[in-house]
């Protein structure tokens, strides 16, 4: 008797600057899925945050002009309906598992995870709270600091307090090399390296177009960029380390290097570091994974200063799966193939869903028989 295939909804797109990156990741994941195990339905979130039905999404996935297909789909939809952004989910047969490949907003900030939770369906990766905390650089740093995990010093600037943070104060507290970052953006979007007052003013103005919270971080001169992949739930494992070297003259691994022209970027797989540094980075990554409550997977980025001291940069709960993405490549050199990695991620999502299903959320679990009634011994 043939075993029933798992029906997987593969979601990509979204309203972030990483929309097209998401599409490339989704293609690679689809190609890596064992079609003897999985029936795969494609769904795309448009740049407006509207979920298209399977038919329109598949057309775009297969290469038809996105703008044209989206406009045709919109004409058939009641965009003013209360559930218009997710109504397309009702047009497909029962879904067993959700596999979001949505980078940035909607996908990594806890939004779609909340949707899957409401639908009572398993999904890949971290849950609502972990996704939200890991996507917000300010919240991430607060948790890392509480857990005693080394990261760069920073100041949080908001519209309410920005007048307090002049360039002279920034230099006094953080030094004369800083990075300005929107709190909730991925793929280095809106990030500026700053070492003059003029650059600082320009960077702040740009960063505030992406978020109402902006981080100003102390910079590290001539850092080595090292990454590590994590896989698992309660007992995660770590991959071998990978390294990134940007072209001479480029200041850091920015959006251009990641997705527009990566021809000059060198990926060291594995990167050669001494055993003590490798162990310290691995230990820091696993500790951060636990502190942030991550599940399934994460890619965690590090900067190593000229003295060989590692600083945890950023965690990524839904790392890229493009042709140059390091998350799957680091697992490949660690002995886990692309298709096996996808199988494991799906199984981890199912296991976490089953574990959460054992938890109690009713009043009896709190020692209360009914609302307003307290039980006394």
Swiss-Prot record:
Binds 2 magnesium or manganese ions per subunit. GO terms for biological process: cell wall organization; peptidoglycan biosynthetic process; regulation of cell shape. GO terms for molecular function: ATP binding; D-alanine-D-alanine ligase activity; metal ion binding. Residues 141-347 form the ATP-grasp domain. Mg(2+) 2 binds at residues 314, 316. Mg(2+) 1 binds at residues 301, 314. One of its GO terms (cellular component) is cytosol. Keywords: ATP-binding, Cell shape, Cell wall biogenesis/degradation, Cytoplasm, Ligase, Magnesium, Manganese, Metal-binding, Nucleotide-binding, Peptidoglycan synthesis. Its cofactor is Mg(2+); Mn(2+). This is D-alanine--D-alanine ligase. Its EC number is 6.3.2.4. ATP binds at residues 171-226. It is an enzyme of class 6 (ligase). It is found in: Cytoplasm. Cell wall formation. Pathway: Cell wall biogenesis; peptidoglycan biosynthesis. Gene3D superfamilies: 3.40.50.20, ATP-grasp fold, A domain (3.30.1490.20), ATP-grasp fold, B domain (3.30.470.20).
């Amino acid at each position: 008797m043939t075993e029933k295939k798992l029906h997987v909804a593969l979601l990509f797109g979204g309203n972030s600057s990483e929309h097209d990156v998401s599409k490339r990741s989704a293609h690679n994941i689809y190609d890596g899925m064992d079609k003897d195990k999985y029936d795969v339905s494609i769904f795309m979130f448009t740049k407006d945050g509207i979920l298209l039905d399977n038919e329109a999404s598949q057309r775009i996935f297969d290469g038809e002009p996105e703008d044209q297909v989206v406009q045709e789909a919109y004409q058939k939809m009641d965009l003013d309906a209360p559930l218009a952004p997710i109504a397309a989910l009702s047009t497909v047969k029962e879904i067993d598992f959700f596999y979001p490949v949505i980078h940035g907003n909607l996908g990594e900030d806890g939004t779609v995870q909340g949707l899957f939770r409401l639908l009572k369906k398993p999904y890949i990766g971290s849950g609502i709270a972990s996704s939200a905390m890991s996507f917000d650089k300010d919240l991430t740093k607060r948790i890392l600091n509480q857990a005693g995990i080394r990261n760069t010093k920073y100041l949080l600037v908001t519209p309410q307090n920005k007048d307090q943070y002049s360039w002279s104060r920034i230099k006094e507290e953080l030094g004369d090399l800083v990075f300005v970052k929107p709190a909730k953006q991925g793929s280095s979007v809106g990030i500026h390296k700053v070492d003059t007052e003029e650059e600082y003013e320009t960077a702040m103005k740009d960063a505030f177009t992406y978020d109402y919270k902006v981080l100003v971080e102390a910079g590290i001169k001539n850092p080595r960029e090292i990454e590590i992949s994590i896989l698992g739930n309660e007992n995660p494992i770590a991959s071998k380390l990978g390294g990134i070297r940007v072209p001479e003259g480029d200041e850091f691994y920015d959006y251009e290097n990641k997705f527009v022209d990566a021809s000059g970027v060198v990926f060291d797989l594995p990167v050669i570091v001494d055993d003590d540094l490798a162990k310290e980075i691995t230990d820091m990554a696993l500790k951060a994974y636990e502190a942030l409550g991550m599940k399934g997977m994460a890619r965690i980025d590090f900067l190593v200063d000229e003295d060989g001291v590692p600083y945890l940069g950023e965690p990524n709960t839904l790392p890229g799966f493009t042709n140059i993405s390091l998350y799957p490549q680091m697992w490949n050199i660690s002995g886990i193939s692309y298709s096996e990695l996808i199988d494991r991620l799906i199984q981890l999502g199912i296991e976490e869903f089953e574990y959460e299903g054992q938890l109690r959320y009713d009043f009896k679990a709190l020692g209360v028989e009914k609302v307003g009634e307290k039980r006394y011994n």
